[in-house]
Structures are given as C-alpha cells and as structure tokens.
UniProtKB/Swiss-Prot annotation:
<feature type="region of interest" description="Tetraacyldisaccharide 4'-kinase">
    <location>
        <begin position="1"/>
        <end position="336"/>
    </location>
</feature>
<dbReference type="GO" id="GO:0005886">
    <property type="term" value="C:plasma membrane"/>
</dbReference>
<comment type="pathway">
    <text>Glycolipid biosynthesis; lipid IV(A) biosynthesis; lipid IV(A) from (3R)-3-hydroxytetradecanoyl-[acyl-carrier-protein] and UDP-N-acetyl-alpha-D-glucosamine: step 6/6.</text>
</comment>
<dbReference type="GO" id="GO:0009244">
    <property type="term" value="P:lipopolysaccharide core region biosynthetic process"/>
</dbReference>
<comment type="similarity">
    <text>In the N-terminal section; belongs to the LpxK family.</text>
</comment>
<dbReference type="InterPro" id="IPR003758">
    <property type="entry name" value="LpxK"/>
</dbReference>
<dbReference type="Pfam" id="PF03966">
    <property type="entry name" value="Trm112p"/>
</dbReference>
<keyword id="KW-0418">Kinase</keyword>
<protein>
    <recommendedName>
        <fullName>Tetraacyldisaccharide 4'-kinase</fullName>
        <ecNumber>2.7.1.130</ecNumber>
    </recommendedName>
</protein>
<comment type="function">
    <text>Transfers the gamma-phosphate of ATP to the 4'-position of a tetraacyldisaccharide 1-phosphate intermediate (termed DS-1-P) to form tetraacyldisaccharide 1,4'-bis-phosphate (lipid IVA).</text>
</comment>
<keyword id="KW-0808">Transferase</keyword>
<keyword id="KW-0067">ATP-binding</keyword>
<dbReference type="InterPro" id="IPR005651">
    <property type="entry name" value="Trm112-like"/>
</dbReference>
<keyword id="KW-0444">Lipid biosynthesis</keyword>
<keyword id="KW-0441">Lipid A biosynthesis</keyword>
<keyword id="KW-0547">Nucleotide-binding</keyword>
<comment type="similarity">
    <text>In the C-terminal section; belongs to the UPF0434 family.</text>
</comment>
C-alpha cells in the first residue's frame, strides 16, 4: 500500500484540519447546482447527446473499461460515438486528438488506452475546456452523433443527456469517507440522487443515501487474461504462462496491486519497480533471463513503441449489468425523436447532409444514394445496414 492510499484510509490531525475545507467544497458545489437549476448560471447545450461517465472517488479502475464497453454498445446500435476527456488533471492545452502514436506524457495514459482499444472507430480528444474540446471533436468528425465525456461530473456548464456515476465500494477506494482534500470522495453520496444511474463496483451491494428511485447497475470483474503487446490478437491465461521465467515490470503507485494480482493467479515472477511516470525505453526490458515480461494495462501505452514479443499485458475487464445498455439507449431514443437533431446528422461516408424521410424512417444520402434506417428510434449509421437506392427511385 502506498502513502496516499494510506492517507485516504486514515483520519489524522491533518484530516481534521482539512475537514472544514471539505465542508466548504460541498457547500460550494451545492450552491452551483442550485444556480444552474434556476438558470442563474447558464449551461451549454451541444448539438448531439452527451453521456457523462465519472467516478465519485478520485480514481476508479472500472471507468476506462466501462467507457470502452459503452462506446462499443453505441457502435453496435449504429451510432457514431466520440470521447472527450481532460486527459490528465494538469492539462491546460487546447483541444487535441489522441492517436495511437501520441505520447502518454502529453495525453495521459488513460486517454491513450481508450484510443488503443477503440482504434480508429471512435475518436478521442482531450483538452482543458470540455466544451471547447467537444466542439473541436464535432467539427473534425462531423459523423459523430453522440459524445461520451470521460469525467465531467462536476462540470455543470456542460448539459448532459445521461449521467452515470461509478461508486467503488472497496475499502481501498472508499477510504475514510471524507470529501477531498480530506478524503478520496469528490462529492457526497447525496449527489448520487441527481444522477441517472449508479454503477456499483466492488462486493458491497448497496450504499447509503441512495433512494430506490435511482437505477443501480452492478459490475463485477471478469477473469483476468493477458494479451501480447506486439500482437494484441494473441491472448493467454495464467495457466498458459505458468512455468516460464517471468519478469514483472511496474511503476509506482501500481506496484502492490499488480503483484498481488499476479500472486493470486499463482504466477511466480521477478519484480522490477520503476518510479511513477517513468518513460520506458528498450533497455528497461533487456534481460536474457526473462522469457515473459508482464506489465499492467496502465503501463502498456508507454511501451507501444517497443517491439518486444516477450511483453504481455495483464488486462482486467468488468462485466456490467445488461440493463445499462437499455437505459442509455432509452435516453438516446428520446433525444433522436427531435427532428432538429436528425437534421444535423451527416453521412459517415461522404460527410454530406442527409434528408430525413419520416414516412419511411430513413435518412437519405443524396450523393451516395444510400438510405440509413432509423431502427427502434436510433439512426443506424452503418454502411452495411444502409439500403442502396435504385437508379429509378427519385430523391426529393
């Protein structure tokens, strides 16, 4: 356990000194919410639906996996999602797209991890101002028709159409139960009454101050597996790696959690620990003794430029209640009932405008002569699902 995890779990004289600051922060956030609800402060409405995914604690290992799942849910439904994020807390840069070749020190590891898993199918942009970042993404990717905001729980300037808050109920993340800076909570549990869904991670099945009116979604870890960094399609379980000479490379503060996971998987490893935010180079992995080198997923994005077939990544995925898909799509159906939203959609191929045919529930691309169906209230913007218009069919 590192020093800040210990800090989150205890109550010391320093915590008592910081407790009034936490109370002032809660009061400030409550006043801001009141002012936005009364329209005294103005929030910004973007042209496409906004989905906020955030954690009530300072960090959650579930969030990245959850965002990837939601992006895949939206794509499977025929939508074209994009993702916006701050990237890292001290990011004061203008909106920037994250690509697979981006440097993790400039983009943040989690944003690069999202890009690594979603590749070119879902653009990821980071920036200090979430609204400006969203506008930049939509301007560069006109085919995007829904945005996922990785964080933004407390950014009330940004109007949201769906908001889900992750609550990690494990002891290490719930800690001393105090609000920052005295504890790991970013807001009080009472804040959860104003969200669309609460996603519980951990073994605890309920949390205080949650009314029955709030939809609670449960998530649980799936079986861990490894994938080869150079060849991601190659996967293995712990049994497939057992008996080999294994080195485990990890950066603080992830050391103990990573090594505990490997011990739980009954793998015998030789650990090598590097400082937090270490920039990996090829010589860090030079070892004639190691047949296999294991790294956590958070560090994998720092090693993409290294071409070493011995590097395998421990991936922990989380299975989410299928009900999450239904409540997200229900919210989006309500949004897409507005013809004004359908009017701004563009063809994903030519990026040209579409003609909404209400009688046929189709969106027509005149240039490519394609008709995209509106199925169960959701515009299915997939070429494979589009109807090719015959030459004799007139487009009006």
């Amino acid at each position: 356990m590192n020093w800040y995890e210990l800090y989150w779990q205890r109550i010391t004289p320093l915590h008592l000194f910081l407790w009034p600051v936490s109370q002032l922060l809660i009061l400030f956030q409550s006043v801001r919410r009141f002012l936005y609800r009364r329209a005294i402060l103005t929030s910004i409405h973007l042209p496409v639906p906004i989905i906020i995914i955030d954690s009530i604690t300072t960090d959650s290992p579930v969030k990245t996996s959850l965002i990837i799942q939601i992006a895949n849910i939206l794509k499977a439904a025929g939508l074209r999602p994009g993702i916006i994020s701050r990237g890292y807390p001290d990011n004061h840069r203008p909106p920037t797209r994250v690509t697979i070749s981006s440097h993790p020190h400039l983009t943040g590891e989690k944003s690069l991890l999202l890009t690594y898993h979603l590749r070119e199918t879902c653009p990821v942009w980071i920036g200090y101002d979430r609204i400006e970042t969203a506008k930049a993404l939509l301007n560069a990717h006109k085919e995007c028709n829904v945005l996922i905001c990785d964080d933004g729980l407390q950014d009330l300037r940004l109007q949201r159409d769906f908001e889900a808050v992750i609550v990690d109920t494990s002891v290490i993340n719930s800690g001393n139960g105090l609000i920052m800076p005295a504890g790991p909570l970013r807001d009080s549990f009472a804040r959860l009454k104003h969200t669309d869904a609460v996603i519980l991670a951990g073994h605890q099945r309920r949390i205080p101050d949650i009314t029955d009116e709030i939809r609670t979604i449960h998530t649980r870890p799936q079986k861990e597996h490894f994938f080869n960094l150079s060849w991601p399609e190659l996967t293995a379980d712990a049994a497939g790696l057992a008996g080999k000479r294994i080195h485990a490379i990890v950066c603080d503060p992830d050391t103990q959690n990573f090594l505990d996971n490997l011990e739980f998987l009954k793998l015998t490893v030789t650990p090598r620990v590097f400082p937090e935010n270490h920039h990996f180079i090829a010589t860090d992995f030079q070892s004639d003794e190691a047949e296999i080198i294991l790294i956590p997923e958070e560090d994998a994005v720092k090693c993409l430029s290294l071409h070493d077939d011995r590097i395998w990544v421990l991936q922990q995925e989380y299975r989410v209640d299928p009900g999450l898909r239904e409540i997200i799509l229900k919210k989006l159906r309500e949004k897409f009932m507005d013809p004004k939203l359908l009017d701004i959609l563009v063809c994903p191929l030519c990026k040209g405008s579409l003609i909404y045919k209400k009688d046929r529930l189709e969106l027509i691309c005149k240039a490519d002569r394609l008709a995209y169906p509106i199925r169960d209230g959701i515009p299915v913007m997939l070429e494979d699902e589009a109807r090719k218009l015959p030459d004799e069919e007139e487009i009006k």
